[in-house]
From Swiss-Prot:
EC number annotated for this UniProt entry: 3.1.13.-
Family matches, as Pfam families: Dis3l2_C_term (PF17877), OB_Dis3 (PF17849), RNB (PF00773), Rrp44_CSD1 (PF17216)
Necessary cofactors: Mg(2+); Mn(2+)
Source domain of life: Eukaryota
KW Manganese (keyword) present: yes
Enzyme's top EC category: hydrolase
Chain positions of site Important for catalytic activity: D353
One Gene Ontology cellular component annotation held by this UniProt entry: P-body
Protein name: DIS3-like exonuclease 2
Main localization of the protein described in the UniProt heading: cytoplasm
Subcellular location: Cytoplasm; Cytoplasm, P-body
Family, similarity comment: Belongs to the RNR ribonuclease family. DIS3L2 subfamily.
Protein source organism: Caenorhabditis elegans
Length: 848
């Protein structure tokens, strides 16, 4: 079932009008308190209008968009190369700009689709695109100027002078250059142009065609519809029939301005700039955490329904109370209950799906060499979750758990993810284990896979493990740690943690030496009060304790991938990561070189080596690292699940990890692909028969899980931005240090150093100059009699990539945050002057 066909979330409208004087929630569906004030109205039942699916408007029937060509024509065009197939990406800051990967590969810039050529397609849709004539392509000004200087300025026959050099208008098509400067289409190389395409057919509607937004009156009172304006600018405005809307909206629309509704697009005709749609329901007051969270969940179609009785009844066990591991399981499972097994997780985690143990052994290689046994124990979810059951279908559709700032929307019922499957301390739990025998230098000699029984001794938080690592000589007491079961001591837990830490460091170094890459982008962490409102915000810091767990999860995933690929070469579910887009990573490298930070992105190893140069702990190093990480992440392609059926071995490669086989095995509580991998590994080991699912079915699951994983990530990111916005609205304007990421003629993008948040700063109301070729923006500050002494006169300041500036974060609208550049102080200007010499010597544009 494709995303757009899914019936899961889009439901028949409920109440579509604000009701009562005051609605107060002490904790809404997503846990945040909300108070909504409205004017009194009487509730009325929803009545479906007879003409709801045949909206007519009074617009000129002239076609605004071109009609789609037939599927047969599309298939033929893709086959003969006159068209190509791609996934549409719409610029969230400018819905008139859309992008697709170039059909000739990643060494070419993206194909650009502009304005009406988008032809009613939406974000994420799989579309057929026809390349427009070369004369309609846009000029890539920077590359074009280089070509002009080399090939036209010295051409005596051209008769051109400096006054005839190319126009600097950013969006200028080749046709203009042909007319104005006498060039021909054939002589201008494609590398100087941006390929322009037009969408001719939608092959798959990946976008759900749903949105959250607000209602507006139509400017034409004779029009029988209401305008729905989505919060996501990439979604078109939607015509809603008047019969869907509370009658009182038309007499007092101002009272409805702050309310958020949800709507579903039913059609988008070629003769209308607006889509047709239906109102689904009233969400609540915009700006309230619970309302905005429901908006996020709805827009990304995250299934947050309570699990049905049929789902729960499909479990072999319906209650967790007094549950014990059946005796029959001990007959074939390896028993690790005598080993000191424990978990390391976030402090608030309740779904504990992985545990570790480590111990010294006398023979790690069969030759009497002392070494280590490391056990990675993963919750045996498939013991409870049987293939083909109602719950299995639900889990497959959800694809994964979704983590929001204040809550988790689980993939599985809480009886599994928090009780029966969670590797809680002090109780016997079923697990699926990978056990490694290795030397103290992390040379791997043997891997054992199998079902097992464990008994975790303690639930450590990352903070506890980090305390052990930072204070190895300290004698920890029981009061400093969570409860430890089975008579083990804090000393024993500490020693096992340090043993794991030492070997994890070696494993990590080996991976980095072999070319593994890690790009760490800042992640926000919020301190919440009892009402789930933000009281503080910081960047989540990845420490050695996090890296400890990560290393052993990676190792287990890699070894399991090899095992299932070997046993099921046509059915294995693996995860690959394509290399970055060649042209984009080359452009990023050139950008970084211009600002004095060499970067080599030809391989993951070379890129990793480049990034490790900026791993220092100073404020300057952190700024550089954040900027370069933000730049290098853009050319990266998404890692994806796939079925190995008829795939070449080269397709298996994981660029970031630089390994040939990788999968996800270690989180079956929160990722459905891990469930499939558990079943495949169990079949490879002879525990059960191989699944009857054919490769095409497995690939369909992979595709769906790729989609749900992306939707969950985007929802999680939006939730973080929601909470950040609420925090700024609570605290008021905030002055922050920021680093410039990119410069345009009317604005520039900055990375807020303290929070890792990217904001756009507009300077369109200031006097300014912009040099496109050097990407340098000069701002002219007017005289200010209220400024500090010595800083009152008019002066200019330059904005280039990697400059450090100060901005004010200001509450904007209901929950949004805008950034405004701060007038540089006299001290900052003096520092700037004193660093100019150093900048010239090093080629760096960092301003401290």
């Amino acid at each position: 079932m494709s995303a757009v066909e899914s019936p899961v979330i889009v439901t028949e409208p409920g109440s579509l009008k604000p009701q009562g004087l005051t609605q107060t929630a002490t904790g809404g569906k997503f846990g945040a308190a909300a108070t909504v004030k409205t004017t009194p109205t009487k509730a009325k039942p929803y009545v479906k209008p007879q003409n709801a699916n045949n909206l007519q408007n009074n617009f000129n029937p002239r076609k605004i968009f071109t009609e789609y060509i037939s599927k047969e024509e599309t298939d033929a065009g893709i086959e003969d190369g006159s068209m190509f197939k791609g996934v549409l990406r719409i610029n969230p800051k400018n819905y008139q700009e859309c992008f697709l990967d170039h059909p000739k590969g990643t060494n070419h810039p993206d194909v650009l689709v502009l304005g009406q050529d988008r032809n009613r397609a939406m974000q994420g849709d799989v579309v057929a695109v026809k390349i427009k004539p070369k004369e309609d392509w846009l000029v890539n000004y920077v590359e074009y100027v280089k070509w002009w200087a080399e090939h036209k300025k010295g051409d005596r026959n051209s008769g051109k002078t400096d006054n005839n050099s190319p126009n600097k208008t950013e969006k200028r098509c080749l046709r203009n250059e042909i007319q104005d400067n006498g060039v021909t289409s054939d002589e201008v190389p494609d590398s100087c142009l941006i390929t322009i395409g037009a969408i001719v057919h939608i092959l798959e509607k990946k976008h759900f065609r749903v949105a959250a937004g607000k209602l507006q009156l139509m400017p034409n009172s004779a029009n029988p519809n209401v305008l729905f304006v989505a919060t996501d600018s990439r979604v078109p405005r939607i015509l809603i029939p008047k019969s869907d809307v509370d009658k009182e909206f038309f007499s007092r629309p101002k009272d409805f301005e702050r309310f958020l509704y949800t709507a579903k697009i039913t059609d988008w005709r070629a003769e209308s700039v607006y889509a047709d749609g239906r109102l689904v329901k009233l969400l609540g007051m915009s700006g309230e955490i619970d309302t905005e969270t429901e908006r996020i969940v709805y827009e990304h179609q995250i299934d947050h329904r309570e699990f049905s009785d049929e789902c729960l009844e499909s479990l072999p066990i319906t209650t967790a109370e007094n549950w014990k591991v059946p005796d029959a399981e001990f007959e074939y499972r390896r028993d690790f209950r005598s080993d000191i097994v424990f978990t390391i997780d976030p402090k608030t985690a309740r779904d504990l799906d992985d545990a570790l143990h480590a111990k010294h052994i006398d023979d790690c290689d069969g030759k009497g060499t002392p070494g280590l046994e490391i056990g990675v124990h993963i919750a045996d979810v498939t013991f409870f979750l049987k293939e083909g059951t109602e719950l299995d279908k639900w889990a497959s559709e959800r694809g994964n758990s979704t983590y929001l700032s204040q809550t988790v929307i689980p993939m599985l019922p809480r009886i599994l993810c928090e009780q029966l499957c969670s590797l809680n301390p002090g109780v016997d739990r079923l697990s699926f284990s990978t056990v490694f025998k290795m030397s103290y230098e992390a040379e791997l000699y043997d891997v054992w896979f199998g079902r097992s029984v464990i008994r975790s001794r303690v639930k450590l938080a990352y903070e506890h493990a980090q305390d052990f690592i930072e204070n190895p000589e300290k004698d920890f007491t029981c009061d400093e740690l969570p409860d430890i079961s089975d008579g083990n001591t804090p000393f024993e837990i500490k020693e096992k943690t340090l043993m794991l830490h030492r070997i994890a460091q070696v494993l990590r170094q080996k991976r980095e030496d072999s070319g593994a890459l890690r790009i760490e982008l800042p992640r926000l962490k919020f301190a919440l009060d009892e009402d789930k409102k933000p009281q503080g915000v910081s960047i989540y810091e990845i420490k050695d304790s996090n890296k400890l767990v990560e290393e052993f999860m990676l190792l287990a995933n890699m070894e399991v991938a090899k095992k299932i690929a070997e046993n099921f070469p046509e059915h294995a579910l693996l995860r690959n990561h394509p290399p970055p887009k060649e042209k984009m990573i080359k452009d990023v490298a050139e950008q970084c070189a211009r600002i004095g930070f060499p970067l080599d992105g030809r391989t993951s190893g070379l890129l990793s080596t480049s990034l490790r140069k900026y791993q220092g702990k100073s404020r300057l190093d952190m700024c550089i690292r954040q900027v370069i990480s933000s730049l290098t992440i853009k050319p990266m392609q998404q890692a994806k699940y796939f079925c190995t059926f008829e795939m070449p071995l080269s397709f298996y490669h994981h660029f970031a990890l630089n390994v040939d086989h990788y999968t996800h095995f270690t989180s079956p509580i929160r990722r459905y692909p891990d469930v499939i991998v558990h079943r495949q590994l169990a079949a490879a080991l002879g525990y059960n028969e191989r699944s009857e699912r054919v490769p095409e079915e497995i690939q369909e699951i992979c595709t769906r899980c790729n989609d749900t994983k992306l939707a969950s990530k985007e929802a999680s990111d939006e939730s973080a931005m929601l909470y950040f916005g609420v925090f700024i609205h609570q605290t008021g304007p905030m002055k922050c240090q920021a680093v410039v990421l990119g410069v345009m003629d009317l604005s520039f993008d900055v990375l807020i150093v303290e929070y890792g948040v990217v904001k756009r700063v507009y300077v369109d109301k200031m006097k300014r100059d912009f040099n496109k070729s050097t990407e340098k923006l000069t701002i002219y500050w007017p005289a200010d009699p209220n400024a500090e002494s010595g800083n009152r006169e008019e002066f200019s300041s330059s904005i280039q990539m990697c400059n450090v500036v100060y901005v004010i974060l200001v509450p904007y609208k209901s929950i949004e945050v805008s950034a405004t550049i701060v007038r540089p102080s006299l001290e900052q200007r003096n520092i700037l002057k004193s660093t100019l010499k150093d900048m010239k010597e090093t080629g760096s544009t960092i301003l401290q």
